[in-house]
C-alpha cells in the first residue's frame, strides 16, 4: 500500500474522469496530476454531526473528480484529519487507492485532542 500520492496513482485517478471532467481540470504540479479544485476541512464545530458531514463530503468529492484534500492537525481539534482518514477507508473500499489522492497538511501546531480543554494552559503544560 502506498503511503502517499504518486505520479502513477494520480495519473490513473485523472484517467477515470477522461471525457467527464472539463478540459484543464487536471494539471501537473509537483510531479503529480492534481484536480483544479480541492476540498478543505477547516471550519465547523468539533462534533459528530460535522464529522459525519466531512467524511461524506470528502468521499463525494473524490468520487466526483477532486483528488486534493486540505487538512491540518489544528483543524477542529484534530477531528478533520481523522475525518480524512475515515473517508480514505471508505474510498479504499470503493476502489480508490491512496496513491491517487493528494492530502495537504501542516505541521508545527500544538492542538487539543477532540475538543477545547477547560484550561488550555494546563492541558499543554501537563500533556
Predicted regions and their residues:
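N-terminal binding-site loop/beta-alpha segment at the start of enzyme catalytic domains
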Residues: 1-105, 111-114
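Surface-exposed, active-site-proximal loop segments in enzymatic domains
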Residues: 112-126
Amino acid at each position: 500500500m502506498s503511503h502517499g500520492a504518486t505520479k502513477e496513482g494520480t495519473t490513473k485517478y485523472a484517467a477515470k474522469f477522461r471525457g467527464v471532467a472539463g478540459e484543464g481540470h487536471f494539471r501537473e504540479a509537483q510531479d503529480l496530476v492534481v484536480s483544479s479544485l480541492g476540498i478543505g476541512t477547516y471550519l465547523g464545530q468539533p462534533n459528530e454531526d460535522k464529522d459525519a458531514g466531512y467524511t461524506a463530503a470528502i468521499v463525494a468529492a473524490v468520487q466526483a473528480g477532486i483528488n486534493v484534500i486540505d487538512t491540518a492537525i489544528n483543524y477542529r481539534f484534530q477531528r478533520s484529519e481523522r475525518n480524512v482518514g475515515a473517508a480514505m477507508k471508505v474510498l479504499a473500499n470503493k476502489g480508490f487507492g491512496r496513491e491517487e489522492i493528494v492530502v495537504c497538511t501542516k505541521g508545527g501546531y500544538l492542538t487539543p485532542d477532540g475538543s477545547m480543554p477547560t484550561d488550555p494552559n494546563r492541558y499543554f503544560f501537563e500533556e
